[in-house]
Amino acid sequence: HRDLHSFPTRRSSDLKKKYLTPVASGKAVGAYSLTEPMSGSDAGTMRSRAVRKGDTYIINGRKSWVTSGPVAEYLVLFTMTDPDKKHRGITAFLIDAKKPGFVRSKKEPKLGIRASATSEILFEDYQVSIEDRLGEEGEGFKIAMAVLDAGRIGIGAQALGIAEAAYEASVQYAREREAFGQKIGDFQGIAFQLADMKTRIEAARLLIYNAALAKERSKKTGERFTLEASMAKLFASETAMFVAHAAVQIHGGIGYSKELPVERYFRDAKITEIYEGTSEIQRLVISRLELGLR
């Protein structure tokens, strides 16, 4: 429920009751919708539009890669209200999927994390009240980035879990599988891989803990934790891919089979390097912060 991070505390109690309560209690599913077919990391190029008419906005456009899109009752939607301002023209809205003009489109056939449904969402003259706007016009990108800061810590934790599962499976297999008259774990080629896997896992864990602590401190200080979150997400996601790849290799032929779960860990790990900002975007964020650039 990372989407709850995008809900400003100053919103009315009626809106909180309508949107926050059912999602926070698990009675409803929420979603976060920023990406479009032609707009990923470069959010300022999004083509969806929200045109204001009095106290109502008319929304048209297509959003893609919406996690829980096929089942979500509510969405936090980011769309363009002033295209000339690029990312400073993005505005956020709370969306009720039951209203006319909300269309669930194709479900994505994904490489991994198949238990999580992902789809496109179409908006066809969808009407939303000004009361359901999050923040002011043009504040959407700022809200989206704040949500991503928190979300990247969660993705780091997800990546860590995948890496740990792949590592544990590899250790167990190395203890049991025999080749050339001995356990394969006795071979340095395997043992050294396991050592590297374990070391990276523990380093990733500490970066995630550090980011989580920075997030907690921000509640008192108001400071952003973008740097810590990006470092944790970058390292943990690349660790997940490194460990999952090594796990398949250690298992050999059976690692390529669906008889064992390591092939799933390999498929599931890849998305952690992509969503919530690719590894390249994380490196860009980290380097710009360290260099004092915007």
Name each model-derived stretch:
Residues 26-34:
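A short, Trp-centered hydrophobic/proline-enriched beta-strand micro-motif
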Residues 1-12:
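Short, small-residue-biased leader/transition segments that mark boundaries at the very start
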Residues 56, 60-104:
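A short core secondary-structure module
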Residues 31, 47-49, 56, 74-78, ...:
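Conserved hydrophobic/aromatic beta-strand scaffold that supports enzyme active sites
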Residues 41, 132-137:
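Cytochrome P450 core scaffold surrounding the K-helix E-X-X-R motif
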Residues 11, 15, 22, 26, ...:
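Alpha-helical interface subdomain recognition
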Residues 23, 38-41, 65-68, 82-84, ...:
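Short Gly/Pro-enriched turn/cap motifs at secondary-structure boundaries
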Residues 45, 98-129:
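Flexible, small-/acidic-enriched active-site or ligand-binding loops
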